[in-house]
From Swiss-Prot:
GO terms for biological process: translation. Belongs to the universal ribosomal protein uL30 family. This is Large ribosomal subunit protein uL30. Keywords: Ribonucleoprotein, Ribosomal protein. The lineage of its organism: Bacteria, Bacillati, Actinomycetota, Actinomycetes, Acidothermales. PANTHER family: LARGE RIBOSOMAL SUBUNIT PROTEIN UL30M, MITOCHONDRIAL RIBOSOMAL PROTEIN L30.
């Protein structure tokens, strides 16, 4: 199954509480934090909600 490398590139400060909670749910706590997640619809939805704060790459 493909995986997604998600890196936080912008701060959650100034965003809504929902956006900050979504970053935390993805496992991102500070700038330049990177996590690798399975490519699933739930994860894609969370990424879409904070797309302006993260960078996403597909990895094998």
């Amino acid at each position: 199954m493909p995986r997604l490398k998600v890196t936080q590139v912008r701060s959650g400060i100034g965003g809504t509480a929902e956006q900050r909670d979504t970053l935390r749910s993805l496992g991102l706590k500070r700038l330049r934090d990177t996590v690798v997640k399975e490519d699933r619809p739930e994860i894609r939805g969370m990424i879409r909600a904070v797309a302006h704060l993260v960078r996403v790459e597909e990895v094998e």
